[in-house]
C-alpha cells in the first residue's frame, strides 16, 4: 500500500497509543517510538508495528508512535487504522487484517 498523505489513529489515554503515519520521501520505513514502557517493551512494540506494516505491504512510511502502555492487539489495530486512512482505502480487504 502506498501512503498518500498523513493520517492519525488512536489516543493518548492510558493503555492506548497514537499512531501518525506519513509518506517517507527518502524511502523505506522509519519508526519513531516514544513510550512509557520503552525500556521493557520497546523492542516488542517495534516488532508488532513493523510486522503489521509488512503484512499490509507498506514499504515507504514515516511512522511516529506515542505509546501509553497499549497491548499488542491495540498496537496492531491502531497501525492498521492509520494505514487505511493514509491510503484512502474504500474497500477493505479483511483477510489482510487478520
UniProtKB/Swiss-Prot annotation:
Localization per Swiss-Prot or TrEMBL: Cytoplasm
InterPro entries from the UniProt entry: CitD, Mal_deCO2ase/Cit_lyase_ACP
Residues carrying O-(phosphoribosyl dephospho-coenzyme A)serine: 14
UniProt keywords, alphabetically: Cytoplasm, Phosphoprotein
Signal sequence annotation: none
A GO term from the CC aspect: cytoplasm
Role this protein plays: Covalent carrier of the coenzyme of citrate lyase.
Family to which this protein belongs: Belongs to the CitD family.
Record text on subunit structure and interactions: Oligomer with a subunit composition of (alpha,beta,gamma)6.
Designated name of the protein: Citrate lyase acyl carrier protein
Amino acid at each position: 500500500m502506498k501512503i498518500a498523505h498523513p493520517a492519525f489513529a488512536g489516543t493518548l489515554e492510558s493503555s492506548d497509543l497514537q499512531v501518525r503515519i506519513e509518506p517517507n520521501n527518502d524511502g523505506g520505513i522509519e519508526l519513531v517510538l516514544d513510550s512509557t514502557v520503552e525500556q521493557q517493551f520497546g523492542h516488542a512494540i517495534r516488532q508488532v508495528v513493523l510486522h503489521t506494516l509488512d503484512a499490509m505491504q507498506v514499504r515507504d512510511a514515516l511512522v511516529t508512535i506515542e505509546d501509553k502502555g497499549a497491548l499488542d492487539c491495540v498496537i496492531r489495530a491502531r497501525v492498521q487504522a492509520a494505514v487505511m486512512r493514509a491510503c484512502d482505502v474504500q474497500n477493505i480487504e479483511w483477510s489482510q487484517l487478520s
